[in-house]
Swiss-Prot record:
GO terms for molecular function: GTPase activator activity. The lineage of its organism: Eukaryota, Metazoa, Chordata, Craniata, Vertebrata. This is Protein FAM13B. The record marks 62 as: Arginine finger. Keywords: GTPase activation. Residues 556-565, 596-611 have a biased composition (Basic and acidic residues). The keyword Disulfide bond does not apply. Residues 573-585 have a biased composition (Polar residues).
Amino acid sequence: MRKSSSPSLSNCNSDLASKIFGIPLDELQQGGHPDNEVPFIVRHVVDYIEEHGGLEQQGLFQVNGNAETVEWLRQRYDSGEEVDLVKEADVPSAISLLRFFLQELPEPVIPGSLHIHLLQLSQDYNNEDEFGRKLRFLLQQLPPVNYSLLKFLCRFLANVASHHEEIWSANSLAAVFGPDVFHIYTDVEDMKEQEIVSRIMAGLLENYYEFFENEEEDFSSNDLSSITEQVNELSEEEEEDEKLEHIEELPEEGVEKSAGMPEVLQLRMTENLLDSDSVTASTRIDAAAATTTNASDGNIKCSKPVAGTTADNEVMQQDFVFEDQKNNESVGILLEPCSDHGDSEDGCPERKEYLLCDSDKLPHLILDSSSKIRDLNANTELEVTEGQSVGVQGEAACIQIAQLDLKNVSDGDKWEEPFPAFKSWQEDCESGEAQLSPQAARMTHHPLGEDCPPVLSHRSLDFGQSQRFLHDPEALDFSSKALSFTRIRRSSFSSKDEKREDRTPYQLVKKLQKKIRQFEEQFERERNSKPSYSDIAANPKVLKWMTELTKLRKQIKDAKHKNSDGEFAPQTRPRSNTLPKSFGSSLDHEDGESEGEPRVIQKEKTPSKEATLELITKRLKENRAERHLPEDIKKMTKDHLIEEKTSLQKSLLYYESQHGRPVTREERHIVKPLYDRYRLVKQMLTRASITPVLGSPSTKRRGQMLQPIIEGETAHFFEEIKEEEEDGVSLSSELGDILSTSVHTQSSLENLESDAEENQEKLARDLCLSSTRAASVPELLEQLWKARAEKKKLRKMLREFEEAFYQQNGRNAQKEDRVPVLEEYKEYKRIKAKLRLLEVLISKQDSSKSI
C-alpha cells in the first residue's frame, strides 16, 4: 500500500514560512512550492483521505474531527514539522483540518469580486448552456493559484461523488465544501446566498470535465497559467535568436529618410501557435485600411501579394519590444515569421518581411498587442479589397513610416509595457481580488465618418461567435451602433487611477463586518480576551467602522421598508468592479431600444391594504357559504371553529405576504377586524377543549380565556371578578342541588344489595360533601385547620423527596421521576382543592368573619 505523504515535505520545510494557516495562497506558493500551485498541505490531506478515507461511510464529511487533534495538527504544520497522518490523525480530523485551512484563508478561493458576479449570474440565467459558458469564462478570471486549488478540490470531490454516488451526491458535497470555498457561513440573512453557492458548487462537481478539463474551448480565456507556460516555451525556443532587442536599418528605394526619424517598433510573428495551449498575443492589421493607403499614396511596395492566411497562420503570435535608438532616426516594423522548429534568421533569410507604413495612416492600423488574446473561432484572415495592386520588389516587402506618433495609440503616459512582462501588473494588485487580462481595458471611441472604411470590431466579451467586422454603420446592431472602439492597454482593472464604481450597501456591510472580525481576532490573539465596547471606542478606526456599519444597516432597513410600500422601484444590482462595461451586453433586451432611451421597469402594481382586506373578507364569506357555516361565531360548533380558524390563518398569511406584518397604528387599525375575529375563534376553541376543575373559583383565570388587551381601550377586570363571584354563588347552589339529589339516590340505592359495593365510595364522597355543605361555620373552620395541617405535612414530605432527588442526580425531579410518590402528589392536589372549597363556603356563609 502506498504511504500517504506530502510531496517532498522535508525539502520544502526549510523554504516554507513559519505559518501555513491564515497565509494568502500566493505567499504559500512563493515560500513553499513555486512550481506547484496547489498548497502541499491540501495535497497531503487529500492523498491521505483517498488512501485511508473509507469514503463509503455515511456522513463522513459532515462529522467534525476531534478539536484537540485538529489544533495539534495545525500547530505541527505551522511549525514546519513533518506530519504522518496515517499514525497521528484520523480521517474526520484530516477532513476538518482541510476545511479549517480553507476557512482561514484571508481571501477565499473564489475572491469577493468574482463571487458577487457568480451570484448575479446564477440569478440572471435559466439556460444551462449559456450559464455554463459564462461560468467557464468567470472561472478563468481567477488568479492561477486560486484556479489550481479550486480545480484540485473539484477533481477530488467529483471523484468521490462519482464512485460513491449513493452515499455522497454532488449536492451534499457542495453543501459541505461550498461555504468553505466561498466563505459563506450559516447566517439568517445569508441563507439564500448559501443556497446559490451550493448550487454553483454542485454544478462544478457534476460538470467537472466540462469546466476544467475541456481545454479546446479555452483559447479565448484569460488563464494566466497557460500564458505563463506559453511565454516559457517561447523563451526556450528563442534562446539562440537575437531576442528581438536590436534595431535593424531597413534599406528602401525611392523613399527619402527625414532627419528626425522616430523609434523602431519590432514585431516578431510566430506561426507555431496552434500547437500551444493558449495565445499570449496577437496582431491584428486592418488590411483594407492599409491597402487604401497604398492606393492613395503609392508608397507601399511588397515583394509578394498579401492574401488570406492559411489555417496554420490564422492566429499570429508576437513579442515586441520598444527601444530608443541613440540617434532616433528610423522607425521599422519587423514582421518575421518563424518556423515551428525555431529556425534562426540565418537559416531562413527569405522568410523575412519588413513592413513600414506612414504614421498619419496609423489610426487605420490597429495593433492589439500581446495583451490581446484571440479566439480561434474568429475570422482572423486579412481582408484585402479588390482592385488594389501590390508591387513586388526583391525578397523583402517594406512599407515606409515617416513618423510614429504613439499618442494616437494610447493615452500618453498610460502606455504600459508589452504583455510578456505581465508580472508587473500581477504584483500591483494587493487586494487579493481576481484580476482580468490586460486585454479587457477601457475603450476609447472614435466617431465613424460616412466614408470611413470598415474596421475590426472591438472585442466585446460576449460568448459564442460574434461579428468581427463593422460594416455599414446604419446596419449595425444595438451593441455596436455608431461607435468604433479601440482598446487602451492597461495593467489591470484594479489600477489606482481607475475610478471604481460605488459599492452597494450590502457589499459595504460585508466588508466592514470582515474588518471588524479581523480586529476582534487580532485583539483576542494579543490579549486572550474579546474586545469590550471600551476597547472598540478606544480605537478611532474601529469606532468609525462600527458607526458606518450602523448607518448602513439603518439605510438597508429603510430601503426595505420603502420598497415594501412601493415608493421606489427595486434597484438593479451593479456590475462587478473588475469586469468591463461590455460584459453581459448580450443580456440586454435589444429589440426596440436604443442607448438614449431609458429603460422602463415594469412592476406589477400591488393592491392597497384596504383592497386586500376587502378581498379577504369576501373570500371568507364565500367559503362559509359553501361549507354552510354560520356567520356568528357563537353559533359554531367545535368543528366549525376549527375550519374557521384555518381559513382565517391562511387569509392573514396571505395579507402579510402582500403587505408585511402591520407595524404602525394605522396598519393595525386597517386589519384589526380580521385579527380580532382570529383571536376570538382561538379563545373559543381553547374554551371548548378545557374541562374546568369543580369548585375552583379561579377556573376562569386559569383556563386561558383572557380577553385580548386592545390598544387604546381600558380593560375592565372588576367585571370579570364579579362574574366569578356570581359563578361561585351559582356553583354553590348547583352543588347543593347535587348533594340533595345524591341523598335521595343514596336512600334508593341502600335497598339494592347488588350495587352496594360499587356505590360505597360514591356514597362516602356524597356524604362528605353533604356534611360539609350543611356544616356550620365552626365545623367548617375545624375542617379547614385539619386540611391545612395535612397539606403542610404532605408538602414537607414531598419537598424532602425533591431535595434528596436533586442531591442524588444533580437535577430537578421530572414527572416520570415522581412515580414512587405519585399517590402523595395526588393526595396533595385533592387537599388543595378541598381547602379552596372550604374557603368558598366560609366566605359565603359569613362574610363578616375573617379566617
